[in-house]
């Protein structure tokens, strides 16, 4: 059995599924660490500190942000979020930033509210699909 993603990805995916949200790991052909059908991409960061810098994280941090920005511009219905596990214990969510500026613990949203929003959207989508059938 091969590993798919980091520990933080696995933990978040489990939390989403337990919350009743359909979600799956991303793949090379589908960008993002976690995909929530039909149009949500979640990118996960797991810094040891209480902030995450796209520039100092690695050479790919800013390039990855740019690639996701281009994808979002090409497909405006895509919703992209960052979920960060700060200092390996405190989870926060962020809307996709307009610039690759640092993400800070005190500026992030709580996961419960984020999960509620995602579940309501999926529930509404399922009701809409049932009506169409």
Residues covered by each model-derived region:
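Conserved catalytic cores of phosphodiester-cleaving nucleases, focusing on short active-site segments
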Residues: 16, 34-36, 40-50
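Short acidic/glycine-enriched loop/turn segments that link adjacent beta-strands
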Residues: 28-31, 88-90
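Domain-level recognition of nuclease-like catalytic cores that cleave nucleotide substrates
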Residues: 3, 79-80, 84-133
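Acidic-residue sensor for enzyme active/binding pockets
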Residues: 9, 43, 64
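Acidic-basic catalytic patches of nuclease active cores, encompassing PD-(D/E)XK
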Residues: 1-25, 30
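Short, surface-exposed beta-edge/turn micro-motifs
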Residues: 31, 38-39, 78-81
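Short, charged, amphipathic alpha-helix that recurs within catalytic cores of restriction-modification
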Residues: 54-79
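A short, conserved, highly charged catalytic patch centered on acidic carboxylates
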Residues: 22, 28-30, 44-54
């Amino acid at each position: 059995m091969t590993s798919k993603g980091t520990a933080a990805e696995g933990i978040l995916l489990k939390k989403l599924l337990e919350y009743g949200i359909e979600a799956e790991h991303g793949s090379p052909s589908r960008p993002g660490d976690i995909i929530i059908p039909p149009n949500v991409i979640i990118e996960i960061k797991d810094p040891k500190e209480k902030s995450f810098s796209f520039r100092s994280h690695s050479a790919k941090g800013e390039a990855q942000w740019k690639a996701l920005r281009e994808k979002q511009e090409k497909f405006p219905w895509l919703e992209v979020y960052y979920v960060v596990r700060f200092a390996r214990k405190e989870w926060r969510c962020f809307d996709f930033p307009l610039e690759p500026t640092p993400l800070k613990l005190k500026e992030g949203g709580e996961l419960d509210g984020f999960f509620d929003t995602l579940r309501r959207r999926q529930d509404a989508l399922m009701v809409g699909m049932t009506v169409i059938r």
